[in-house]
């Protein structure tokens, strides 16, 4: 016999966010007829290994529950079983679910309660949005960035960068499964996460608890999906094209369904039931873009329909090739995620997670829109490897150990070989015209197309000779201890260590000499002002402690965080001389590289005789006295000096107190630190 009731369960979301990946379920179970607490009532989350029983006060606590929707079962001998259908667990929140059991003489009777989440989260102490996987499925978006744009306090700049509360793009911290995922060079997401793989997306655009570091304006915490004991899968795809009735966009009149498409699929399920599960997904995504250029000229200054056989006429195959449109902001990408969860040992869960994505494409360059094959192509690749071990010490405490490595590689170039002979400057056509090296029939036939000045018009010859390469790697270790020490206090203590590696090489191909009409590509020397090149390996360390106090209707969060940053690098002793191979002071030109590295800025550089015949000695440092910003330079030795460690102690506090069933007072204070 089943009795179906629709009730509103008392679900309360507690605490300022802990950057974790699990939530907590608490409540009290009573005898409906007598009002007495039920001791030893079983509380079971169906289709999982999680459960507990009520104590002598009828109260229960379940920690470390992954976010999602669950059926929670209350059962006890002599009472009708109660199934709470659709209980939503949210990361870093406490869900209160109380129950009343009715006596029964018929074994197997049960009551089904449909849980409904309250619209007002009375105790949230910051601006926060929680988006579940079900909500993501219903959104007309395909990228995480598109989801973020829909949240309050978030704005997007012209380059697609995410800003929270008016801050910079680099002031947002991105996390995946509780570990940092930010690219420490740009501040953006280091490895792309697909919407299909997200179980829960948490966006905080306010104050943060002590567990959060490396953030000033916002935190984005993504919890990825796990496999279960049932095989599940899905396929998502779309195809289309860009169209516009505005004539400022070229070649958008025709519709081609293959111009923009995406295909993604995922599969999850058990490898060994109740012991080992998996989740696997993949996606391919391609777009030809919406900004097209009419490919009219070759990189050498000829039209693509030029007189190839030098007979002064356009004939044969020459007339069959015409200018054509080509997408100039296209991209081609793929991604994959694979996650295995082990629940083999008692009270211990071990997870292995890998995320890989690759993308290549071009950014629109207005000045090169008429040139065939002259734009650089961008190549980027992201890889994430994560290991997560969770061990329950008791029903009210557990520890987590997380180890991760995040790699992001980005390259941008036209030709793979930097000394490729096809490199040619945009001025080459202009120089050829000035030197009368363009055939007269080309000038007569195409007129103004070859009569141009490169500084004021679209390029009709040459290539983009920029080259950019960087590699970023972050290795992270996190250890956390969480304990519900009593009814009112949940403490969390942890440490966080990251080791970074940043390599960058940025330059443009140069001409070996400007005295001839032949362009011979060369690579600028490292250390010169025309080339930025470095490799740094800084480290970050943090420890924190926080307490969440839940007393009646009041929620208090208090925490303390210490964090330090060690650049492990060298910087110039003289702020006006950043380039050791290109000194600004002419007096330094005669010194060797070894002498520059060990220079004594107080040494005599040169001697002059004034109008009175007096000899005046000038030191190297005197050259910079006019700036009046380095009074101690003459006492310094060496071109470089070591950086220092930066550290900070950050207090965090927050209070939430409901004043009615429709209102709550929030207060929060924090001191935040980010390099």
Question: Which role fits each region the language model picked out?
Answer:
Residues 18-114, 119:
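Periplasm-facing N-terminal accessory domains of Gram-negative outer-membrane beta-barrel systems
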Residues 80, 85-96, 110-210, 214-219, ...:
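Periplasmic N-terminal accessory/gating domains of Gram-negative outer-membrane beta-barrel systems
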Residues 115, 235-241, 280-286, 352-356, ...:
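Transmembrane beta-barrel strands of outer-membrane/channel proteins
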Residues 141, 272-274, 345-347, 394-396, ...:
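Outer-membrane beta-barrel channels and translocator barrels
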Residues 160, 218, 231, 261-265, ...:
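Hydrophobic, lipid-facing positions within transmembrane beta-strands of outer-membrane proteins
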Residues 256-360, 380-398, 651:
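Transmembrane beta-barrel wall of Gram-negative outer-membrane proteins
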Residues 323-327, 464, 473, 484, ...:
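Signature of Gram-negative outer-membrane beta-barrel scaffolds
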């Amino acid at each position: 016999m089943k009795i179906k009731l629709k009730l509103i369960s008392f679900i309360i979301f507690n605490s300022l966010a802990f950057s974790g990946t699990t939530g907590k379920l608490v409540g009290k179970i009573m005898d409906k007829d007598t009002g007495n607490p039920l001791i030893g009532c079983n509380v079971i989350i169906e289709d999982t290994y999680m459960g507990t029983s009520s104590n002598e006060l009828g109260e229960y606590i379940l920690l470390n529950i992954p976010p999602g929707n669950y059926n929670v079962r209350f059962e006890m001998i002599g009472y009708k079983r109660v199934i709470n259908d659709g209980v939503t667990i949210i990361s870093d929140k406490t869900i209160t679910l109380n129950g009343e059991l009715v006596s029964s003489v018929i074994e197997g009777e049960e009551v089904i309660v449909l849980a409904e989440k309250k619209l007002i989260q009375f105790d949230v102490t910051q601006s926060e949005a929680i988006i579940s996987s079900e909500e993501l499925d219903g959104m007309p978006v395909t990228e995480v960035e598109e989801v973020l744009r829909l949240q309050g306090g978030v704005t997007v700049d012209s380059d697609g960068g995410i800003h929270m509360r008016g801050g910079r793009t680099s002031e947002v911290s991105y996390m995946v499964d509780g570990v940092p995922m930010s690219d420490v060079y740009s501040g953006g997401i280091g490895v792309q996460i697909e919407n299909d793989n997200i179980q829960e997306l948490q966006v905080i655009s306010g104050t943060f608890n002590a567990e959060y570091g490396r953030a000033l304006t916002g935190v984005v915490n993504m919890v990825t999906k796990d496999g279960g004991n049932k095989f599940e899968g899905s396929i998502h795809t779309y195809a289309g094209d860009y169209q516009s009735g505005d004539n400022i966009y070229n070649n958008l009149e025709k519709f081609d369904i293959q111009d923009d498409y995406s295909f993604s699929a995922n599969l999850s399920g058990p490898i060994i039931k109740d012991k080992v599960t998996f989740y696997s997904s993949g996606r391919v995504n391609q777009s030809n873009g919406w900004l097209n250029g009419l490919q009219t000229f070759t990189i050498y200054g000829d039209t693509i329909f030029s007189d190839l056989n030098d007979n002064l006429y356009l004939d044969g195959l020459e007339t069959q090739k015409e200018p054509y449109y080509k997408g100039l902001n296209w991209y081609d990408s793929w991604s994959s995620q694979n996650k295995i969860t082990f629940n083999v040992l008692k009270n211990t869960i071990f997870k292995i997670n890998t995320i890989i994505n690759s993308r290549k494409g071009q950014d629109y360059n207005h000045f090169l829109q008429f040139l065939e094959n002259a734009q650089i192509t961008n190549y980027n690749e992201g890889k994430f490897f994560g290991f997560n071990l969770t061990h329950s010490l008791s029903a009210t405490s557990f520890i987590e150990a997380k180890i991760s490595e995040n790699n992001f590689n980005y390259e941008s170039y036209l030709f793979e070989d930097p000394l490729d002979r096809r490199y040619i400057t945009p001025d080459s056509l202009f120089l050829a015209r000035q030197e009368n090296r363009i055939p007269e029939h080309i000038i007569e036939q195409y007129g103004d197309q070859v009569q141009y000045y490169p500084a004021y018009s679209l390029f009709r010859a040459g290539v983009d000779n920029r080259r950019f390469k960087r590699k970023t790697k972050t290795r992270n270790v996190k250890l956390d201890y969480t304990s519900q020490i009593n009814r009112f206090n949940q403490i969390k203590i942890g440490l966080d260590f990251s080791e970074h590696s940043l390599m960058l090489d940025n330059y443009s191909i140069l001409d070996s000499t400007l005295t001839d009409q032949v362009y011979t590509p060369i690579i600028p020397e490292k250390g010169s002002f025309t080339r930025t090149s470095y490799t740094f390996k800084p480290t970050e360390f943090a420890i924190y402690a926080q307490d969440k106090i839940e007393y009646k209707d009041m929620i208090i969060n208090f925490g303390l965080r210490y964090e330090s940053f060690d650049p492990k690098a060298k910087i110039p002793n003289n702020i006006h001389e950043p380039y050791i191979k290109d000194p600004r002071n002419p007096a330094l030109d005669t010194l060797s590289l070894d002498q520059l590295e060990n220079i004594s800025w107080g040494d005599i550089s040169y001697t002059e005789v004034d109008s009175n015949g007096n000899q005046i000695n000038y030191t190297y440092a005197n050259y910079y006295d006019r700036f009046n910003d380095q009074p101690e330079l003459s006492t310094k030795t060496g071109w470089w000096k070591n950086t220092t460690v930066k550290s900070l102690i950050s207090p965090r506090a927050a209070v939430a107190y409901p004043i009615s069933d429709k209102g709550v007072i929030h207060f929060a204070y924090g001191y935040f630190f980010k390099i």
